Amino acid sequence: MKNRTIASFLMNRMKRPENRIIVLTGGRQTGKTTLARTLFPDYQFLSIEDPILRGTYARLTAAQWRELYPKAILDEVQKEPSLIESIKSVYDQWTEPRYIFTGSSQLLLLEKVRESLAGRCIIVELYPLTVPELETENWAEPVVPSPFQKLLSALDNTQEYIKSLLPDFALDPAYAKKLKAWDFYTRLGGYPALVNPELDDEDRYLWLLQYVRTYLERDVRDLAALRDLEPFVRLQRYVAFQTGAILNYSGLAQQIGISTKTVQRYIRYLEMSYQTLILPAWERNKSKQLVKAPKLHFLDYGVLQAITQKRGTPSGQEFESLVIAELLNKNAASLWMRTSFTCGPLMVKR
């Protein structure tokens, strides 16, 4: 089992008196439930996906929650939004109870959380494993920050830090482990289930194909209530082939044969279900030299391959998406491009 960078942050936050509710959200199968149960073994685990138990929990009063479940993990809590109001009542009346909500739908979960728990909770997003996390063997092994993460924390002394990386990364004693993690990441992505040593690459690829099917059949139907998935599938596949490209809604509408508003809605579904990131153009001012059109990036290369049904070395744009996804956990990133489109460096705000 791989360690997660965010683990120590969650444990420290839950010790604070003001952080009595943590909302842990992210895409399906990113390890939210495993992380919560591993870090907080003394918390009772309540599966809100169970339709029978769901009704039982919904009937509990605030006093009963405090008595029966003073510390609990509510898994997939968006399935029963009324529970959020119940926990809010517990929070407002007592200081001892602690709760962790997990959920895979950003839209269904966070809209209710923002309505009911504003100022009462912290929201943490969990993405697939990063390269430094893939290097770990277990929870006890610390996650070593990547050179880029270290560079961002050393901006006051950048030149000295860069010199410390020379003459060659290959001289690093951990080079072999890092290379293995990077190879895995650029072939299969970072979903935790894929690191099971009993799986071979063919098993992993089949898992990714099933993940995409499950995402369409469950997440998209829950999120968008779509009766006909075929137009959404066409758009998903088209933008997967175009990951890292400038996002042009009207152009996509013409290519796929749906309205621009429908394209915008479908793109929003992809983003809200943690499949893609819309990276805005860098805008310090209104200069005409800046391109304001955003880029769309898929957040996991393994899922991208399953959608496009291709394997092999990432293309230039796919590699760009790999890098963006790797940086997402740690940094706020924005794109800056000249109107000539001849170069597109990444601007990262410290």
Label each PLM-derived region with a short phrase.
Residues 195-350:
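Accessory nucleic acid-recognition modules appended to NTPase machines
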Residues 114-232, 236-240:
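Interdomain motor-coupling "hinge/lid" segment immediately C-terminal to the ATP-binding subdomain
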Residues 32:
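Conserved lysine of the Walker
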Residues 35, 39:
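Hydrophobic positions on the alpha1 helix immediately C-terminal to the Walker A/P-loop
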Residues 21-24:
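Hydrophobic anchor at the beta1->P-loop junction of P-loop NTPases
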Residues 56-100:
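Conserved nucleotide-sensing/catalytic segment adjacent to the nucleotide-binding pocket
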Residues 1-17:
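N-terminal pre-Walker A segment at the start of P-loop NTPase domains
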Residues 92-113, 270:
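Sensor-1/coupling segment of RecA-like P-loop NTPase cores
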